[in-house]
């Protein structure tokens, strides 16, 4: 059975390679370093998310279709799907390492604004990290969807701002809000009795997940085992469990966010679960 698990993990890795990633941008690295000297903000320095901190300098680019959600498949390296629909509504962004955090920044929310370009409105907009871009454009780099980039413009100047290519912006982290939604779990393709992979999404507050654990049941209709098994981050916001035995559902799933807050979705994955299926919980961060 171990071979099934290995093949599934390999398939997931290949699917990551197929994901449409953010595009490279032309820039002057020396100018970027000079412009951002003294920024003095390290978003990896704390174990807890900090909201509404000082506005911090960054640079923004955009990719995909002018009015799109970024990748042509409306996905991204975080594993989120249908980012052109509610609650993402195409207001998405790739993040560089301090924002994407090797996947642990997936789902986090930021207010961004631009003021220097003549086409900028100066109005702040909220974007969600759904993808990665590690091109060294700036210490903090948002590679926005065409939709999000255009929303920073004055009325009627969306295309003109997009033609600027690279712009200076400011950003601050904010709590995510997904009205009407509970935390969701999408069982990924290739999951099987010895390999279980799940996408976690729609977390209010931090928006991200730093640890996921799974609890099996004793039988299909029996009580839970009472034992939590840590899952491993597969990529983005997808977590997996490889085992040497057949997993017994229903599964309860425990998640912990960046601020250390824990939630448990009891029996959220039913005994008759199927791959490529979404299961909504009854829990949400307050």
Swiss-Prot record:
Induction remark: By gibberellin (GA3) and wounding.
Superkingdom field: Eukaryota
Main location: secreted
Role description: May cause loosening and extension of plant cell walls by disrupting non-covalent bonding between cellulose microfibrils and matrix glucans. No enzymatic activity has been found. May be required for rapid internodal elongation in deepwater rice during submergence.
Signal peptide annotation: 1-24
Localization terms from the record: Secreted, Cell wall; Membrane
Alphabetized Gene3D superfamilies for the sequence: Expansin, cellulose-binding-like domain, RlpA-like domain
Keyword Ribosomal protein: no
Segments forming domain Expansin-like EG45: 75-181
Glycosylation sites: 28, 44, 257
Tissue-specificity statement: Expressed in internodes.
UniProt keyword annotation of Glycoprotein present: yes
GO CC terms: extracellular region; membrane
Protein name: Expansin-B4
GO process terms (BP): plant-type cell wall loosening; sexual reproduction
InterPro entries (UniProt xref): Expan_Lol_pI (IPR007118), Expansin/allergen_DPBB_dom (IPR007112), Expansin_CBD (IPR007117), Expansin_CBD_sf (IPR036749), LolPI (IPR005795), RlpA-like_DPBB (IPR009009), RlpA-like_sf (IPR036908)
Homology family: Belongs to the expansin family. Expansin B subfamily.
